[in-house]
Design a protein with these regions (language model features):
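Acidic/histidine-rich catalytic neighborhood of metal-dependent amide-processing enzymes
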Residues: 1-60
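Active-site-adjacent substrate-binding region
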Residues: 34, 41-149
Length: 149
């Protein structure tokens, strides 16, 4: 299962770019309506479950994106199930910048090597394992999401 829990560890060791951006917005008072983090969205047999912090901070966006996936015909890629929480770049956007941001990240609950998939952080984590159908499902889902706004 992806890393869970309320302790995000040392904030000086992860998501440095999003920490900096959330703390130093490019315009004073800048406020985006929402954010969508795409993390490792091209893997073979990827499925994108509801991520805990996404539902905690931006439930309406989770609902909108997963609904858009169903409308676009990609509900098999976006199951209506919880997949645990992950300490990722969307946390500083939510917690520091106060912009509702979701994380679309694969979760492989049956994978023995890693819940992020069998090639994650291995020498096999390369372009040979990118699936054009998964990328299409995510891309078309995002187009449908924007259409529904």
């Amino acid at each position: 299962m992806p890393r869970t829990g309320g302790d995000h560890g040392d904030s000086d060791s992860w998501a440095l770019g999003s920490h900096y951006w959330a703390s130093h917005l490019h315009k004073p008072g800048y406020k985006a309506r929402f954010g969508i983090l795409l993390d490792m969205v091209g893997g073979q047999q990827a499925r994108f479950y509801h991520e805990y912090y996404s539902t905690k901070y931006a439930r309406a966006m989770v609902d909108l994106v997963w609904h858009a996936a169903a409308v676009a015909g990609y509900s098999s890629y976006f199951p209506q199930e919880d997949g645990g929480g992950i300490t990722d770049d969307h946390l500083p956007v939510n917690e520091i910048a106060k912009i509702p941001c979701i994380d679309i990240i694969p979760y492989y609950p049956e994978c023995q090597e890693s819940s992020f998939g069998p090639t994650w952080h291995t020498v096999s984590d390369d372009m040979r394992h990118i699936d054009k159908n998964t990328l299409k499902a995510v891309g078309q889902t995002l187009v449908q999401t924007l259409w529904e706004l």
